[in-house]
Amino acid sequence: MNVPHPHRPSLWLNARLATMDPAHGAPYGALEGHALLLRDGHIEAVLPQAEADAAAFDGEVFDLQGRWVTPGFVDCHTHLVYGGSRAAEWEKRLTGVPYQQIAAEGGGIVSTVRATRWLDEEELALASLPRLKALMAEGVTTVEIKSGYGLTLADELKQLAAARRLQASLPVEVATTLLAAHAVPPEYAGDADGYVDLVVESILPVAARAGLAEAVDAFCESVGFSPAQTRRVFEAARAHGLKVKGHVEQLSNLHGAELVAEFGGLSADHIEYLDDAGVAALKRAGTVAVLLPGAFYFLRETQKPPVDKLRAAGVPMAVSTDLNPGTSPFASIRLAMNQACVLFGLTPEEALAGVTRHAAQALGRGATHGRLAAGCVADLLVWDIAHPAELAYSVGVPLLKQRVFRGAAQHID
């Protein structure tokens, strides 16, 4: 299969499309025997094969020979820009050493903060590059990257700048999120309110003015920040024109999802302890529920998110890797899909929607990403599969034939 020139229009024939567009009604939004017309980095048309006049087309023509095509994957929740490793800490925990002892010895999130602060922007981007490339190799074309391991003005900005540097060097779209309210740094031990002052009065305004973040996140949890502190962060985000999202209801129910919904948040993430009021709030606000099965698995949790209630209420469910060094060190979007099915009870179709249409919605990109539809960006994946369910069924099997970003393709073979 040839690789199209990135600046020329292209016509992709003989495709089986998993459009993930509910307008088509069929499972996966499937269209058999169709063609895609790509121009200027966007999908210009999705048309039946019989209407695709290859002979008269003024660009490049490619025969997909009946292969399945999906939208490019969207990984809507990652912490992939960081320094260091927590493998030794994980090994200790497996042998029975309590987390409190590890933290007292300088481990835990503080060790990642220390390692991240030690690296400069270029070094941080280089350290994170293999993780991003691993996601791209499985079909990720858009990825969210959070800060949250700097916890000072300079280091939070450095993380966001490193994420932007990665976007500039690779064919991938990066959505940056400020997560300064991730943990209380050592300098503010015992003074969470004082640290929140720093976030809302300094870190967040500077990041907003610099254009380094498009959204603001906060870890609303008993071991993170209280609902009142989270509200302060969200109010500051709104004042600076930034969208909000939240790490909520992961370990307990502090009604953080309702707070996210109150601010019209893009997404409520983790949500293992989400209750009926939280489900209703997400539905009313149009907020996406982001499921993170990797962290659930890695931490050996037992409380599952209320998938049946979310499904019944019609709350869109996204699926993401939560790639991070402490609780989900997995750079595999297809593993997350498999885990969402096996651990949380999603169907393969729901899992695929979770890394395409709904994940795009969780990043405020629902109108332009995550579907094969006219007007959407020309980010698409060509697969060697017999059925779309295979994408969530197997892990580690290289199924991706071609990754197309804004109309330009790369061979995966």
Swiss-Prot record:
Annotated GO biological process: L-histidine catabolic process to glutamate and formamide; L-histidine catabolic process to glutamate and formate
Catalytic reactions of this protein: 4-imidazolone-5-propanoate + H2O = N-formimidoyl-L-glutamate
Cofactor requirements of the protein: Zn(2+); Fe(3+)
Swiss-Prot/TrEMBL keywords: Cytoplasm, Histidine metabolism, Hydrolase, Iron, Metal-binding, Zinc
Record: residues binding 4-imidazolone-5-propanoate: 86, 149, 182, 250, 327
Residues bound to Fe(3+): 77, 79, 247, 322
Protein origin, superkingdom: Bacteria
Major enzyme class: hydrolase
GO MF, any single term: imidazolonepropionase activity
Annotated residues for binding of Zn(2+): 77, 79, 247, 322
Gene3D superfamilies per the UniProt record, alphabetical: Metal-dependent hydrolases, Urease, subunit C, domain 1
Function: Catalyzes the hydrolytic cleavage of the carbon-nitrogen bond in imidazolone-5-propanoate to yield N-formimidoyl-L-glutamate. It is the third step in the universal histidine degradation pathway.
Protein name per the record: Imidazolonepropionase
Organism of origin: Chromobacterium violaceum (strain ATCC 12472 / DSM 30191 / JCM 1249 / CCUG 213 / NBRC 12614 / NCIMB 9131 / NCTC 9757 / MK)
Gene this protein is translated from: hutI
